């Protein structure tokens, strides 16, 4: 496993991390009891970055991840990242959310992120400075954001008084390359890292069948699953290198400087995912994958827009809807 630094001054993390959305999430049918085995296998494979959020299963994912890390005695050896929800309208509520996340985890996270931008009528700086307040309160060691388009990432970073945003966690994969148009170049200019969620397009780039609601309802999963050119390119490169299609898709992101955080409900798959960090793509491999996925640079729009609709939903309604659904 190789390790990279988040941002200019953030923690050193494994080139491939592990996402815990699937653990505790109703949309994935996740089982929190799997967290212990997932963390154990990940640590044995060199993975030290684990990502969760307060809305994943209404906190169940945080609780499961925290319990696993504590039971295995790994707190000082891993980087735990969590996200406070974008429905928190001010610094006071962001600090309150960070404290609640720390209680569920059983410790303060290493990296605290704002999961999505606040509603349009709330000053961006009020929310982002809440992350800085949480930092000063000892509720995290580093701060970042998630689902921020490039221009907003730049504005958010300018809001900070002393701290810096070490990362922007966005959806990024061979099936969704829109971040290359705005997020990636802006992050690079600021010295922030890209953490890539859904790096396998919810399993479509690994040849998965749609077994969960999160897959069946996702347009990008459907598009990538049916894209013969992209699937053939993945199979071709995988066969040449003697690895899996999933490892090729993750290696493509690592090669571009992103830190992918794939998720899984199967502990036996963790070593495969970790192995992607050691896959070496040739120039011909890169060209083939770039060409097969070129349509996905603009197919979903010319500006990153995940969760953009939430910017026009009042915080109270966001909170109530997520609670009623049992979390994300």
Tell where the protein language model's regions lie, with residue ranges.
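N-terminal binding-site loop/beta-alpha segment at the start of enzyme catalytic domains
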Residues: 1-78, 316-317, 321-328
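Acidic (Asp/Glu)-rich catalytic clusters
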Residues: 7-10, 66-76, 99-107, 133-135, ...
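Short acidic capping loops at alpha-helix termini that bridge into adjacent secondary structure
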Residues: 14-15, 51, 75-78, 108-111, ...
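Acidic-and-aromatic substrate-binding clefts and catalytic sites of carbohydrate-active enzymes
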Residues: 26-29, 53-62, 87-92, 119-122, ...
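Short, acidic/polar
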Residues: 29-42, 90-105, 126, 151-154
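A short, structured active-site edge motif that brings together acidic residues
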Residues: 76-88, 111-115, 169-172
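Active-site groove signature of glycoside hydrolases
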Residues: 105-121
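Beta/alpha (TIM)-barrel catalytic core signal, keyed to glycine-rich beta->alpha loops juxtaposed to Asp/Glu
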Residues: 117-299, 305-328
């Amino acid at each position: 496993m190789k390790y990279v630094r988040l941002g200019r001054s953030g923690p050193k993390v494994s080139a491939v991390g592990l996402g815990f959305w699937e653990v505790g999430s109703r949309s994935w049918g996740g089982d929190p009891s799997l967290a212990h085995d997932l963390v154990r296998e990940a640590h044995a494979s060199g993975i030290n970055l684990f990502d969760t959020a307060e809305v994943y299963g209404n906190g169940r994912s945080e609780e499961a991840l925290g319990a696993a890390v504590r039971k295995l005695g790994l707190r000082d050896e891993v980087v735990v990242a969590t996200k406070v929800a974008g429905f928190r309208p001010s610094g006071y509520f962001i600090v309150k959310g960070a404290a609640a996340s720390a209680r569920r985890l059983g410790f303060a996270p290493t990296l605290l992120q704002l999961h999505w931008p606040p509603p349009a009528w709330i000053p961006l700086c009020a929310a982002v400075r809440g992350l800085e307040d949480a930092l000063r309160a000892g509720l995290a060691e580093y701060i970042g954001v998630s689902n921020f388009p490039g221009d907003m990432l730049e504005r958010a970073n300018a809001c900070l008084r002393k701290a810096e945003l070490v990362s922007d966690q966005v959806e990024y994969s061979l099936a969704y390359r829109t971040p290359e148009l705005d997020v990636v170049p802006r992050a690079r200019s600021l010295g922030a890292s890209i953490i890539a969620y859904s790096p396998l397009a919810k399993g479509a780039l690994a040849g998965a069948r749609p077994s969960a609601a999160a897959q069946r309802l996702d347009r990008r999963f459907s598009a990538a699953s049916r894209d013969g050119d992209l699937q053939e390119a993945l199979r071709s490169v995988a066969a040449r290198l003697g690895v899996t299609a999933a490892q090729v898709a993750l290696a493509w992101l690592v090669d571009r400087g992103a830190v992918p955080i794939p998720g899984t409900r199967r502990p036996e798959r963790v070593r495969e995912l970790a192995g992607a960090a050691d896959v070496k793509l040739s120039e011909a491999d890169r060209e083939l994958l770039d060409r097969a996925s070129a349509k996905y640079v603009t197919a979903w729009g010319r500006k990153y827009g995940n969760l953009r609709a939430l910017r026009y939903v009042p915080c109270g309604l966001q909170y109530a809807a997520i609670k009623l659904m049992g979390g994300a």
